[in-house]
Regions:
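Beta-strand-dominated extracellular/periplasmic modules and repeats
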Residues: 1-221
């Protein structure tokens, strides 16, 4: 049996999968993962290293830390899935992006221009303002902006439940009739992703750093 015949045989075993979408996904997965192994001429040692890497990724994952999502993020798969599902052909609109691991629903509703800082750790004061417009450039009044970021110490409130108030530097704001919003906050800072696990090891082995640029998350609805 040749490698190509083996691939065809495995795919044929999936032909009776009752769920049509599952059959489509698994057939494509088998075809592409076999093609990958053949393209790079995967050795038995490399195959086992990959198995052990995925095993460690699962072992370090718990209800707080999702190492598999971190792996997906660093491989660009998370962003690709977001683009496929939420991308727009309109060049004028703001691009969608992944939600990230620190989003918490039901943040407090805050007034126009109100501060969302509830924990003073010496951060640099900042004002975030702008306008929400539709694809035609008209202002969108009453749009909800669900906003969250890290504190000046580099951590999100959800990461420091014993130190920061749970709603520190997060809140829901609403645009006025002109589509304007204004938020008082502190300047966000760069922070590293968790690098003490297998994904961190992979980043180091491939010459990449673990730092994310300073940013503010805004979910508009």
């Amino acid at each position: 049996m040749s490698p190509d015949e083996l691939t065809d045989e495995v795919i044929s075993r999936l032909a009776e999968t009752p769920n049509e979408r599952l059959r489509e996904v698994m057939t494509s997965l088998v075809r592409h993962i076999h093609a990958f192994a053949k393209e790079v001429k995967l050795s038995e040692e490399e195959w086992m290293q990959g198995i052990q890497f995925l095993t460690r990724t699962g072992e370090i994952t718990d209800e707080v830390r999702q190492e598999f999502i971190l792996l997906s993020d660093t491989l660009g798969l998370s962003s690709l899935v977001d683009m496929i599902n939420h991308g727009s052909e309109l060049q004028e609109v703001t691009e969608s992006t992944i939600l990230g691991p620190f989003y918490v629903p039901d943040s407090p509703s805050r007034e126009f221009g109100e501060s969302m800082v509830e924990f003073d750790d010496g951060g640099e004061p900042a004002i975030l303002s702008g306008r929400v417009m539709d694809a035609e450039g008209s202002p969108v009044g009453g749009a909800e902006l669900d906003v969250w970021q890290n504190a000046a110490n580099g951590f999100y409130a959800v990461q420091q439940k014993e130190i920061q108030p749970s709603t520190n530097v997060r809140g829901r704001y609403f645009t006025n009739q002109l589509g304007e919003y204004e938020i008082k906050t502190v300047r966000p800072v760069p922070y590293p992703i968790p690098a003490d696990g297998p994904v961190g090891m992979l980043l180091r082995d491939t010459g990449r750093h673990e730092w994310r640029a300073a940013h503010v998350h805004i979910k508009v609805s």
